[in-house]
Amino acid sequence: MKFTLSWLKEHLETDATLDEICERLTAIGLEVEDVDDKAAYKPFVIAKVVSAEKHPEADRLKVLMVDAGDGKPVQIVCGAPNARAGLVGALARPGVYVPGIDVTLAVGKIRGVESHGMMCSEKELNISDDHDGIIDLPEDAPVGTSFATYAGLDDPVIEINLTPNRPDCTSIYGIARDLAASGLGKLKTKAAPSFKVEGATPVDVKLELDDAALCPGFSLRIVRGVKNGPSPKWMQQRLMAIGLRPINALVDITNYMTFDQGRPMHVFDAAKVKGDLTVRRAKDGETILALDQREYKLGPNNVVIADEKGLESIGGVMGGEHSGCDENTIDVLIESALWDPINIAKTGRSLGIITDARYRFERGVDPEYMVPGLERTTELVLELCGGIAGEAKIVGYKGHQPKVVDFPLSEVKRLTGLEVSSEESLAILKGLGFGVEGTGERVSVTVPSWRPDVDGKADLVEEVMRIHGVDNIKPEPLENFGAVNGRILTTLQIRTRTARRALASRGMLEAVTWSFIPEAQAKLFSGGSPALKLANPIAADMSDMRPSLLPGLLTAAQRNADKGHGDVAIFEVSGTYEGDTPEKQRRVAGGIRRGTASLAGSGRMWSNAAKGGGKPVDVYDAKADALSVLEACGLPMANVQIEAGAPAWYHPGRSGTIKMGPKVVLGYFGEFHPKTLSELDVSGTYCGFEIYLDAMPEPKKKATRTKPALELSPFQAVKRDFAFVVDKSVEAGAIIKAATSADRKLITGVNVFDIFEGASLGENRKSVAIEVQIQPVDKTLTDEDFEALTAKIVGNVEKSTGGVLRA
């Protein structure tokens, strides 16, 4: 929305400077996007083309002799199609900066002919996007004077960025009203138009619509005997300053009303209208040649104004060329109507038409100004074009039913925290045109017809707040969050974050997969229950809520493999679903490894089969990943038990279940069953795991939140290897537990590094090799100390498992 400073001051009595006005506009929610003081236009002068001859070396160029008022014509080479003798336009001499092309002119030769300047187009001056020809001014434009002064370009132009909910500020009068309400001046009011009316308007209007909301009102008046010449200089200057091209007085008046009062108008040449006017839906395939010289094909979704011969206008969007007004117009029909905002928006989008009328109608114009707008336009036509006004015809309009809001003034403080007095709140609302009835802390507020965006109490609070000024809100320090008791994050949230970090530290990459999977995959992982089917899935293969993270991770890994990335290690920490109630949603940390993506060091260090013969991933990689999550989450690993076997999607002999006690299942790990991989259409070597973070027991509450000091031993750790021959039925975990119990203070870790079965060991026997890490605490251990500890380890394993030390 553009307007000049002088135009604004026609409606606002104020001594405020340009900077003060712009600052206040932004403060009250009308953000100033640009201010153009037009200083760059001062060097341009009005000049007349004395002669125009064809360029000797170029068919599309002309050699002009241009008089700038000093009696010394200068030679200019010009390529504009409308360049001709007698044309009056804007001249830029050598040394002048032309903003639209970002060039400072100099004397030069064009195809061998010297040129001493430039006749400019509107686009070259950044006035508009029109570059079809050079500026063509009226013949009586004063040659030799400043073009900026003549065109009103020395008047600062303010452009504000309007939000769609403020149709009242698509008028300069509406902007002035907001500024006056904010205390920056006084709103000027004009007397109601007064003129003599003679005779009836001979054209009737019929509304033939199946939905009255498409055109809630239509008013029409004839003015006979007009003289449609150029509009006065003051009007032309204002229109040109905001980027509009003056055409003739009648058209310029409608454009002026659009910006001045926010009331789009339209004029028909009465002589070109045949019979009465009908407002109706367009017929399928009907066409109209519009004022932009383009033909549009219409349909039943478009509302049109038609006479007996055909279409004359696309209602609320653009008029037709056939009934347009020109210098020969004697009798004019002035239209002021109301249109459905949604239909206008759809019509404009479907036809690709953007006009100032559409911009206002699709946001909503003031319904109560339909007839006053007609009166004001009639007054301007009589003043500028002469003539005799006929009686107005008004059809369809049933009046505006205003909204009334019961408004407790205490809402201002409740919703904003602002300390605004009741007197100021009421003064602001009255200044904005709201009707206020009642006294005390609760009043009845009538919303004005030009504010369709105001609907309830919160909207009224917003009006008070923006005019009072958000700058008046005193800064308040935030509360002291250090005084908050207890943890801000829940235990589950902390464990979720910890699991992510633990798996990332093992070289795995985090993935985010869909929570929706195909029904076949859901059933493969013990899901597919009717309660977990989506009523409206986004795709046919996303019909069920996932019972496990693994199908999504496996298919994601396969997509990577298909693109040449065969060694993949990815994880996800998210939700799975066992039922349709909140307690049936699980928080799970899951991951898979493919190919040779085994952890071979710290960080993202994977072994690679192509570089050194890395081994394929196996059940032990998945086990290590799963246990790392439990350990990072602070579970007592001595109480964690591992049992053989897992759900059906795992390999029956290469998988395990992680438990804490006989009933608490913490998760599963292992290699995947070949049938599972086949059903998912994935290939390769895979292992994976899932840990149920919500199944972990709550940590015991400690007396203090302070962590104990970290104690590090100054002595070197020592590792000892043992190989025990045990029955095949003995689990490795039992051996680890027995070895650890030999001395929990000195033994800091026990790991299995080899399992061997062979005839040399005997029937149903196996060898389990473990590595025991011994960390001295307060002294260096002697050989006697190690021998005693070794004997205790061997004795504990033999007692617990029946195992003997392998020779």
Swiss-Prot record:
Domain tRNA-binding: 38-148
Gene Ontology biological process terms from the UniProt entry: phenylalanyl-tRNA aminoacylation
Coiled-coil region(s): none
Positions annotated to bind Mg(2+): 453, 459, 462-463
Domain B5: 400-475
GO cellular component, as recorded: phenylalanine-tRNA ligase complex
Keywords, ordered alphabetically: Aminoacyl-tRNA synthetase, ATP-binding, Cytoplasm, Ligase, Magnesium, Metal-binding, Nucleotide-binding, Protein biosynthesis, RNA-binding, tRNA-binding
EC id: 6.1.1.20
Subcellular location: Cytoplasm
InterPro entries on file: aa-tRNA-synth_II/BPL/LPL, B3/B4_tRNA-bd, DNA-bd_dom_put_sf, Fdx_antiC-bd, Fdx_antiC-bd_sf, NA-bd_OB-fold, Phe-tRNA-ligase_IIc_bsu, Phe-tRNA-ligase_IIc_bsu_bact
Primary location group: cytoplasm
One Pfam family named in its UniProt record: FDX-ACB
Cofactor(s) needed by this chain: Mg(2+)
Record-level Gene Ontology MF annotations: ATP binding; magnesium ion binding; phenylalanine-tRNA ligase activity; tRNA binding
UniProt domain FDX-ACB: residue ranges: 713-806
Cofactor note: Binds 2 magnesium ions per tetramer.
Subunit structure as annotated in this protein's UniProt entry: Tetramer of two alpha and two beta subunits.
Similarity comment: family membership: Belongs to the phenylalanyl-tRNA synthetase beta subunit family. Type 1 subfamily.
Name of protein: Phenylalanine--tRNA ligase beta subunit
Gene coding for it: pheT
